[in-house]
Amino acid sequence: SQRLFNTLMQESIGNYNKYIIMNFDNEQFSDILRKIDPNKLLLLDFGKFNKDAYSYICQDFDRGLYLGMLSAIDSLRKYKKLVMVFPKYLKHPQSSKQYFIQFCIDHGFLYEIYESTEECNPQQNVAYLIIKQQNIVEFIKKSRKLNLKCGYDFGILAYNDTPSYEIIDNGITALTIDWREMGEKIAEFVLNDRKYQEYLPTLLRLRGSL
């Protein structure tokens, strides 16, 4: 919660030489962070707010998502419909849904958005953009009970790559930033006082699920 975030931040202020923090919300800068020296603070991931006075390495959950899906369009064209699974209470920018919808409209896809994998079953000729890793595992289990093959009967596109996506089923295609690049830049900020103000590009990791 915002209250817990504020409490943790308040207790840590003045105790460290550098602060590497993911802001609580993507849309609004947390006021508690204004108490930290801007030269000591690096903002990560969320950042759809004015942050010109700070170093940041962020994801673009809006246009980045759109462009990432565009890079996968040849694979997505195999499917007649795109479905986004976006859990109601997931701490992921809600604006991603609007860019998903806009992509589908711009490129002629039928589309739907569900709040959980319990609300939908794998269907033939449908590709699913699934944000949460646990939902992907649940969805693969469902598909096996229905004798549907991921990457052939239906598709899956994940958000944010993980090592497990390389080995789940025949590999899960993911839209992701380069986490190694982010880690290297964090180290530069901490060790060498390197300043950053950038959004990392959204990349496509194409695997068997699409």
Feature names for model-found ranges:
Residues 1-13, 66-67, 95-98, 102-128, ...:
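Structural motif
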Residues 1-67, 127-128, 134:
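Alpha-helical recognition/docking segments in bacterial nutrient-uptake
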Residues 122-127, 134-210:
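Flexible loop/turn connectors
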Residues 66-107, 198-210:
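An alpha-beta-alpha
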Residues 11, 71-75, 102-103, 142-146, ...:
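A generic secondary-structure signal
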Residues 1, 43-46, 107-119, 150-161:
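A generic structural motif
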Residues 47-83, 136, 175-195:
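Hydrophobic alpha-helical segments within soluble ligand-binding/sensing domains
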Residues 33-38, 76, 146-151:
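Short, conserved loop/helix-junction motifs that constitute active-site signature segments
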